[in-house]
Amino acid sequence: MALTIDKKAIQPINTLPLITRSYNLLQDYLAISKFKVVAMLVLTAWVGLALAPDVGRGMGVQFISLLGIGLLSAAAAVINHVVDSEIDSKMARTRHRPVAKGRLSKAHALSFAAIIGVAGFIMLMLWANTLTAILTLFALVGYAFVYTSFLKRATPQNIVIGGLAGAMPPLLGWVSETGQMAAAPWLLVMIIFTWTPPHFWALAIARKSDYARAKIPMLPVTHGIDFSKTCVVAYSVLLAIVCIFPYLIGMSGLIYLIGASGLNAVFIYKAIKLKLAANDDTAMDLFRFSIIHLMVLFIILFIDKWLLL
């Protein structure tokens, strides 16, 4: 008797080589972890650590402390992807994200968040101190749950209020080194806190229709683009003022003052340019520059510290 095979009964299998599937999974993990954003947060935490009084901790211990902060920050980003997956699927900028696209299930993503979050917390408990671990956990809860689950959907001031969680890394870096709270690192927190609204409002101006479609009450959606442009200029000026304070209290020297002044002059110029000629190009130009601004500002802080000027 001839053997017959029902071709319809044959289930398709993944023919991609294992190395390709592993690479794709790694790319998805990096995407839901917001690797580039977390790298920026770790940079600011590192500068906070570097500016703290030297207590003789080794570089290896400092590295593990920063890694712990980074892993908890990445866990918060993953939770954000899960909570926002339905919103992300409605927005052109985010609809190809792994969870929104269905490449990773919510359960898979949350399991990944739990693993890296627990690992980061243990690192901070063992190689930093309890205060750093608790503060970093609070920052995770603030971003992943208070901001993402509530504030983002509730008020046009979502970025202003929720920005505190994302501004914490310099304080976390400082506390990981000293084990104590201090006034000085709060100035660095205030810089990021003040930087956050114009950074995100510039993006929201360029992507207003996306946010409106997803029913996210960003400022340009609820109050209009013209009012939002005015707020961007106002916060840009406020940012320039806040950035002077590390120099005024002796936390930094002339290199920082000159560098910060130049960066903020460009920031204000681009904000005014957006105010006078608002379109997607000017909005995205400010958004992209704001990322460079924050990164270079903190690098200058570090250089200034170690040149002792």
UniProtKB/Swiss-Prot annotation:
Any one GO MF annotation of this record: protoheme IX farnesyltransferase activity
Alphabetical keyword list: Cell inner membrane, Cell membrane, Heme biosynthesis, Membrane, Transferase, Transmembrane, Transmembrane helix
Cell inner membrane is among the record's keywords: yes
Name of the gene: cyoE2
Something else known: Carbon 2 of the heme B porphyrin ring is defined according to the Fischer nomenclature.
Protein name: Protoheme IX farnesyltransferase 2
Pfam families membership: UbiA (PF01040)
GO cellular component: plasma membrane
Cross-referenced NCBIfam families: cyoE_ctaB, PRK04375.1-2
UniProt-listed Enzyme Commission number(s): 2.5.1.141
Catalysed reactions, as listed in the record: heme b + (2E,6E)-farnesyl diphosphate + H2O = Fe(II)-heme o + diphosphate
